[in-house]
Amino acid sequence: MLGKVITVANQKGGVGKTTTAVNLSACLAALGKQVLIVDIDPQGNATSGLGINKADVRYCIYDVLINDISPIDATLPTEIEGLQIIPATIQLAGAEIELVPTISREVRLKRALEVIKDKYDYVIIDCPPSLGILTVNSLTASDSVLIPIQCEYYALEGLSQLLNTIRLVQKHLNNQLAIEGVLLTMLDARTNLGIQVIEEVKKYFQDKVYRTIIPRNVRLSEAPSHGQAIISYDPRSRGAEVYTDLAKEVVGI
């Protein structure tokens, strides 16, 4: 197996980060890949968005990071063939503080994933919307980072902090970390603003910007409340189409 680890990160909330982590993972699995999604966001939206009832979870990513539970024991199946998840529960909210005195705290996730990543073609990590120790763990454990950017006026605001964090991780913790790509999300095709943002982001990131752009899509925003990825909830929707296109870009088809 390829065992490629990709973190989906942006410390700005509401940019389509979890939507992208869930639907990219599901679409990679639909292409026949073996995929693990790791939910490391205390809100646990990727977990509930894939239909996992948090009350039924025995072990989550918190147990892996803090209690040295094997990631194999924390992995659960989803309704999508080829897609498994290490879930997050509210316990994870305390992990940032609990990790502070821990030796080698930045590499806890990296060490855990080394045990299992070769069982998968792709491991996709859904980060919290912050640049704390959980995000640093994710970047340290990853081969690359995928950055979703919303097509809005302040699109690039705050990105310098994320890019600076990536540079620090590259320098001190993971010199192999690369930018996988930049994904434009929530495009409203009716506005000129979206077109301006696309041009601005392409000027800044050049060939790192994916050809696929995620539009605003009602079905895409409805799917998580049904505990389903878009390809399960409405496989014929525009949302399913564009995330399938993104998965093909990531794979190189």
Model-identified regions with their sequence ranges:
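P-loop NTP-binding core
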Residues: 1-253
